[in-house]
Amino acid sequence: MHIAIMSRNKNLYSTRRLKEAAIARGHDVKVVDHISCYMNINMTSPSIHMKGVELPKFDAVIPRIGASVTFYGTAVLRQFEMMGVHPLNESVAITRSRDKLRSLQLLSRKSIGLPVTGFANKPSDVPDLLDMVGGAPCVIKLLEGTQGIGVVLAETRKAAESVIEAFMGLKANIMVQEYIKEAGGADIRCFVIGDKVIAAMKRQALPGEFRSNLHRGGSATIVKLTPEERSTALRAAKTMGLNVAGVDILRSKHGPLVMEVNSSPGLEGIEKATGIDVADKIIQFIEKNVKATSTKTKGVG
C-alpha cells in the first residue's frame, strides 16, 4: 500500500516508528507536512499539493495532527477523505474529540464515568459553579490546553474564584472539575486500536505535582486494567468515533473516570513502558481495514 503520514516533523518518535513499521511490512510511506499542503477543491478532480507538486495517490492516511493546527490539519484530512483515501481516524472524529467540552457531553450522554464538570460564562455564576463540583480543591482547565498546560489545581475556594475570574477576564474558555484526591496524582493511559485495548500504562506525577503528563516529568509503568476500566476505554473511543485513541482514566472510589480521549496519542511513552510494538499493531489494523469507500462521512460535516 501507499501510506501517507500527516506530521509536522518526520523526526518525531511517533512519526518515525510508524514509518519504520509500515516499511517493515512492505508498504511505501511518505511523511506529509499538512501545514505545507494546499488544496484544489473542485467537483471533478480534487487534489492536494505541496511545494508546487501534486501529491500522489495514497491508499491510507495516518493523521498526526497537533492541537494547535487542528482546523487546517483536519481540512487537509477531509480532502484526503473526499479523494477516497482511507483515514486511520476520520476528520469528524478528530474534531469531535478535540472539543473538550463537547467530548465530555457526548461521553455523559453514553453514561460513561466522568469527573463532575462545570462550565459557565459569567463571573457571577462562579460560586454556584464551584458548589456543583463539590467546592475546593478543584481543577480548572483551559479548553484549548494540551499536555497539562493551562491546568490549575485550586486548593482553596478563594484561590479557585481568583483563577476562574482571571481566566474569564482574559476571555478564555475554561471548565471546572472535581478533584479526585484518591487518584493520588496518577492516571491510566489506555491505548485503543479498533475494538481492543492493546496496551496500558500508569502515569505518576512528580512529588508535589498533580499533573501526570509525561511532558511534565511524570513517570510511566505498565499496569493491569480491570474489566471495567477496559470497557470504559473502549466505550469512550467508540463514542468519539476513533479507531485509534489514547483514553486517559482516573481510578476513583466511584470507578473509572474518563479525563480525555486523545485522537493522536504519542507512541514513545506507551511503547517504552510496556515493551509493546504499538506502531506495528497500528499498521496491521490499517491493512485489515483499508477500503476506498470505508470513510463513513466521506469528509462531510
UniProtKB/Swiss-Prot annotation:
UniProtKB keywords: ATP-binding, Ligase, Magnesium, Manganese, Metal-binding, Nucleotide-binding, Protein biosynthesis
Cofactor: Mg(2+); Mn(2+)
Entry GO terms, CC: cytoplasm
EC number(s) recorded for this UniProt protein: 6.3.2.-
Organism: Shewanella denitrificans (strain OS217 / ATCC BAA-1090 / DSM 15013)
PROSITE patterns given in the database record: ATP_GRASP (PS50975)
Ligand binding (Mn(2+) 1): 248, 260
Domain ATP-grasp: 104-287
Family the UniProt entry places it in: Belongs to the RimK family.
Top-level taxonomic group: Bacteria
Binding locations of Mn(2+) 2: 260, 262
Record's keyword annotation contains Magnesium: yes
UniProt-listed NCBIfam families: PRK10446.1, rimK_fam
InterPro entries: ATP-grasp (IPR011761), ATP-grasp_RimK-type (IPR013651), ATP_grasp_subdomain_1 (IPR013815), RimK (IPR023533), Rimk_N (IPR041107), Rp_bS6_RimK/Lys_biosynth_LsyX (IPR004666)
GO BP: protein modification process; SOS response; translation
Protein name (Swiss-Prot/TrEMBL): Probable alpha-L-glutamate ligase 2
Residues holding Mg(2+) 2: 260, 262
Molecular-function GO term, any one: metal ion binding
Residues binding Mg(2+) 1, per UniProt: 248, 260
PANTHER family reported in the protein's UniProt record: RIBOSOMAL PROTEIN BS6--L-GLUTAMATE LIGASE (PTHR21621:SF7), RIBOSOMAL PROTEIN S6 MODIFICATION PROTEIN (PTHR21621)
Cited Pfam families: RimK (PF08443), Rimk_N (PF18030)
Enzyme class: ligase
Amino-acid positions noted as binding ATP in the UniProt annotation, renumbered to this chain: 141, 178-179, 187, 211-213
